[in-house]
Amino acid sequence: MTTPLSSYSTTVTNHHPTFSFESLNSISSNNSTRNNQSNSVNSLLYFNSSGSSMVSSSSDAAPTSISTTTTSTTSMTDASANADNQQVYTITEEDSINDINRKEQNSFSIQPNQTPTMLPTSSYTLQRPPGLHEYTSSISSISSTSSNSTSAPVSPALINYSPKHSRKPNSLNLNRNMKNLSLNLHDSTNGYTSPLPKSTNSNQPRGNFIMDSPSKKSTPVNRIGNNNGNDYINATLLQTPSITQTPTMPPPLSLAQGPPSSVGSESVYKFPLISNACLNYSAGDSDSEVESISMKQAAKNTIIPPMAPPFALQSKSSPLSTPPRLHSPLGVDRGLPISMSPIQSSLNQKFNNITLQTPLNSSFSINNDEATNFNNKNNKNNNNNSTATTTITNTILSTPQNVRYNSKKFHPPEELQESTSINAYPNGPKNVLNNLIYLYSDPAQGKIDINKFDLVINVAKECDNMSLQYMNQVPNQREYVYIPWSHNSNISKDLFQITNKIDQFFTNGRKILIHCQCGVSRSACVVVAFYMKKFQLGVNEAYELLKNGDQKYIDACDRICPNMNLIFELMEFGDKLNNNEISTQQLLMNSPPTINL
């Protein structure tokens, strides 16, 4: 008899057993009255284990059916040629399938109080975590570290990917091949919904913990104990609790000092008080200062300082940091305290190393009588110990720029600049050298006759040019020179011409008047420049000579105060006198504020 292939395939399909979670749940519900410890997941896992052996046994029992199925699906010609044999094989296959159904029912018939032991619970391929019906997070739970193969709970989201032959019932290392995965075990993504029942062992749940979570309701967390003391913790514990209030800081510890407490007490140990006599500080010192020096004072009482050096016997500070005191060159240092007095201006300052002698090749000279008068006056002042401050010696200076420059002396007051209200010369023009050269302010304000002088030099742009009022002008005999300077003019370029003119008239014994608006700045710089060129002096020496004067030959002009710009011009003029390659102006541009001249 010939049987079509389609009918054969229908026969096999109708008799092939189907396995699903619904059938598994029905089997589990029928057996739940007899066995309280079994559940749907255990039945499923036990079925997977028995199914493996069942497939192997069915393969041994009916190899003909498998080969027949393969032959019938791959070769249609053989199926039509052996129609009689197909009927016999179909009957044999139906018997084999009936056998499989009977073995399946027997395998799921679990006796009461009996737990399947074919596979350890730690090697389940799929496991339903406890109490996760409302679990929506994908965070993996805590892994179990127990080594018990029969009763140790296994953390959810652990799947065994090891080969089947290594899944031994009594494996000592359960977590060797486990991988911690993040699974979303929501009800909509799983085929089973029955939760695992609570363990019926003697250990009771430790308690319910309620934590604030971002959700609207507080979810109780059940901690289920087991035989080994390991717990399941609900995954809601992993959620960040909402902060309802700012935690308050504990009260600060009291810092009040008191007697030291006993060793066994829990209070903070406090150091004993140190008396003021040991600390050597006044009662008005702050507490912070007392605490900062307490340890230093304790070390100081036990350390003997080294012996003080001879020069620091009277010092109150550290003997190692006291420099030796300099002795005066006059030998007046007797260990007495040195009284420091402010530097007095005008007549109390001494001016040394000034000479009226000029080099032999110099084009300028003075009369021998004048030099003798300077020397005699100097000797008279030294013998009488007078208060005159100008001392002239016969030492010729090698350079006019060998003094230290102090900028504070030359800072001019603002009221002395461009001010006509100041009268620096109430008694008329000042004699600045041998009654031949005179310094004065604006002659138009002083009501003096300029025709009494042979040379009149006006260096102020504010003063009127009185050349028309100057009578009988003769070159090199009677002249009026007008140079309109301001307080910021570059006067160094004109000083050579002016000083040469002054020296020419001075050598011939003619009277010279030098003036500006006030007679204390621009005209004073002309006189200082003449001193520098005539006597080969530096800026400081020439300035001090004009300011302090000499009782007989030079009147003291203590009101002079040229500004800094004019002082720099005088320094520039001094560099040109000495033929210096680097000018003072260039030096000041690249030098610190304090310089040595």
Swiss-Prot record:
Catalysed reaction, written as an equation: O-phospho-L-tyrosyl-[protein] + H2O = L-tyrosyl-[protein] + phosphate
Region (Disordered): 55-89, 107-172, 188-228
SUPFAM superfamilies xref list: (Phosphotyrosine protein) phosphatases II (SSF52799)
UniProt biased composition (Low complexity): 55-81, 136-151
Biological process terms in GO annotation: negative regulation of MAPK cascade
S-S bridge residues: none
EC main group: hydrolase
Residue stretches making up the Tyrosine-protein phosphatase domain: 428-579
Keywords annotated in UniProt: Hydrolase, Protein phosphatase
EC number from the UniProt entry: 3.1.3.48
Residue spans of biased composition, Polar residues class: 107-126, 188-206, 216-228
GO CC list: cytosol; nucleus
Catalytic residues (UniProt): 516
A GO term, aspect molecular function: protein tyrosine/threonine phosphatase activity
Family in the record: Belongs to the protein-tyrosine phosphatase family. Non-receptor class dual specificity subfamily.
The protein's name in its UniProt record: Probable tyrosine-protein phosphatase
Lineage: Eukaryota, Fungi, Dikarya, Ascomycota, Saccharomycotina
